[in-house]
Amino acid sequence: FDGNMVVIVANARHMKNVPGKKTDMKDAEWIATLLRAGLLQGSFIPSQPIRRLRDLTRYRKSIVEEITSQKNRIEKHLQSCGFKLSTFLTDIFGVSGRAIMDHLARSGRISPQDVDQYVKKRARTKLNEIKLAVNGRMDHLQREFLKILLKRLDESYEHLQLIEQKI
C-alpha cells in the first residue's frame, strides 16, 4: 500500500445482508454501503508484541492441560497397580508422593520402612494410612511405564518453566 488506503478488518456478523440470492458483487456493494454510512466498526487487531504474548500464553495453557492429563494418567496407573496414594496424600505429586513414586518406579514395591523415609512434614500425621495405601506391586513393564510417565511429566514441567520465562 502507498499509504493512501485505510484497511478495515470487520466482523462478518456485523454486516449481514438481507436474505435472498447472494453474489460476491452484491456482498461487496452492501459492504461498501455500510462503510460509507459509517456503520462498520473495525475489529480489534492487537499489536505484534501482544500477538506474540497471546501465542505464548495459549501454549502455556496447553502445557498446563497436558500436565494435568499426565498426572491423571500416572494416578490411574498407580491405582491399577494397587497403590492408592491419593486416598491419604493431598497432593501425590508433592515431595512425599513424588519420592514414593520414584521409589516405585525403581523397585516396583515399597516397604513400610521406606515409607517412613520418604514421607515428609504434614503427611507424617497419616503415616499408618499411607503404609496401608502402598501395598500394591508392579512388574517390570509397569515400572518401566511409570518411569516413562514420570519422565514425560518432568519434561512438561521443564517446557512450562521455559514458556513462563518468556512470558
Enumerate the language-model features and the residues they cover.
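A detector of single, family-specific signature residues
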Residues: 1-167
